[in-house]
């Protein structure tokens, strides 16, 4: 391929993909010692990649390739999240079955991945709808059930009438409570459901977030808010009904305000609210017809019941209110209108009393009739507790109120995993009239899906032959569970299976999982923060408690990628017709162009708009690099010391290697590409000089090719071959700087500032034909003044002028010291005098090329005083000669 004269991306990419495949370049051996584990969230098998997919998988591929070149064994696998309702719907629409549809989609997507050159270990490919995989979903279910982490109970659940299935809380989105999949408004149903008891791990799920330093803070915050730990106090109130008294516990975070509780509120579905509805038509009408927890205003109705405030002994009314939720707290609350905004709004609407019991500390006042005072303060009108601060009052009231106790509440709910659809993992339970629900024995797993039948409702419920079975315990006739598992269970542990995809004795080889996990770098969207990522953490912790894992967190590092937007800056969508098909870009420009553009446009976490101009620019850049590599004298060697221009280029090459390596470590591929782009531009300029050193050009181009290899791997392989490289560049050693470039940033700043100063002089003076440029560095004593100023403890001028060697420079030294004192502590960070002259000397060729005039770099003592007196450390003086008219 290296003999081609043009950039034929079709031929180049197909060739190198075959070569990589034949050589098993991306295969990681089973005996690898703790390989770097790089993983992108595996795709749902929709059958069609979009540009967001390209970006997501280009990110992990670039990082995996980099780490491989840097000497690591790398585990970079791919699999298919292949169960789910969309495949079932597609099968119904096309008169096929979900398995055939899914397999076609997988074949198509695999071809697309391979066309993009992603380096996966395909020997580890997994597919969640394969019985060999979902057998272990079922095993996990029964093991977790034996451990007390799975329970079946009647519950009010979220129901999507369009999908005809239950949704977990995490799958109901937004204030409008829409289905996460189809945007249908979600309703509620009472059903017997299977639950994973995620709440058993609530504290650890919350506390463990503090240790996940490699995760974005916004994802950790989303999980914190979702778990929603609240510390408070449970206080029993005695509710008086015509049928007798009943103690009802209310949860509060502000027990210090209990003296101000003027009514007691119940959720509409609280048992006492239902009892009140049985006795009062107004309450029944409210509960059945009016209550709206999502309404803009709190609504409610007073009952004939009363409650006793345990702090005051006062009788207070009991109301049923729709702002009280049965699944938040206890479904009952003490209402304190003076110190809670919602309680205040309701009290005003229903003419209930407002009693202030907390006042601001100090002279500030609060008009609680006008608005609730919700901050802590000092108790008033609170009997023996008057005068206490809120915190102290909370402690004493908790201890003093009979039956009160500190408590913790969570927003997190158990994970309902029952789904009333076909295309998912059958729940491995048999229902026996005598024995109840019985787990299917391990030896009988997997319970495979029956043949698909087009029907309405729950398809498995219609599969009579499949459904009828015998009880594993007593042998009596029994019925299989007809619900399937939430497909998020499939993805909650798949990353463990990649370590040992053919393991037959358990979901994964424990020893290898302990050695290879957690995942070092995981990439996917932050929309998975409170579903997939939370479930994966729960399952990992549960596996650890079953002694199957040593670690308790699945992902050490997490990167959440931003969207690829349309050229109009909005989200790509069919309705807006602003999408871009990856196939078109790959066909027209090549896979490397698609990869390069998506990685150079922005850092992974940021969204960016699509740009055809940016795509063309990326393609042009690759053409230029390939052309340079083919023209380089790869056998050239450097004889003796390099001249200043060659040394400049050699240093820039070394600095680019160092900078790009840092950017790759940080997954800032856009900055790495920018550094390589600048190096290539410099090499083009230098290569065209008559005295260019071929070995320096070859070294620079070779470094650029290696640095670009993780991002544009096909072109990099073609360049590597042209440069005479051995084997694959994908397996070549990552470049390292061959020079000390610790002063590179200061040298670059000096050179750029000097070039800008020359430009300003030429432009301001209107010099059209400069005949010479003198760049004069400051006298050495000024660097000594700067050093003394940096070491001074406050009195810069005094410190400088106490130095006898500087006193001889009199007012000049004092004036410079005063200038520095005004800048303290932000002193200029500069090279020494020799360092400045060396750096500028290496850059003379750039200045001469830009201004088309000879350039001299002079020490102050070698220049005219009128010029030298203007120089300062880090800011040489400039003199430009021009031709006489």
Swiss-Prot record:
CDD domains hit by this protein: Anticodon_Ia_Leu_BEm, LeuRS_core
Motif segment ('HIGH' region): 43-53
GO cellular component, one term: cytoplasm
Binding, ATP: 574
Single GO MF descriptor: ATP binding
Region (Disordered): 866-885
Enzyme Commission number(s) from the entry: 6.1.1.4
Alphabetical UniProt keywords: Aminoacyl-tRNA synthetase, ATP-binding, Cytoplasm, Ligase, Nucleotide-binding, Protein biosynthesis
Placement of sequence motif 'KMSKS' region: 571-575
Class of the enzyme per the UniProt entry, highest EC level: ligase
Location(s) in or outside the cell: Cytoplasm
PANTHER family xref list: LEUCINE--TRNA LIGASE, MITOCHONDRIAL, LEUCYL-TRNA SYNTHETASE
Protein name: Leucine--tRNA ligase
Gene (UniProt): leuS
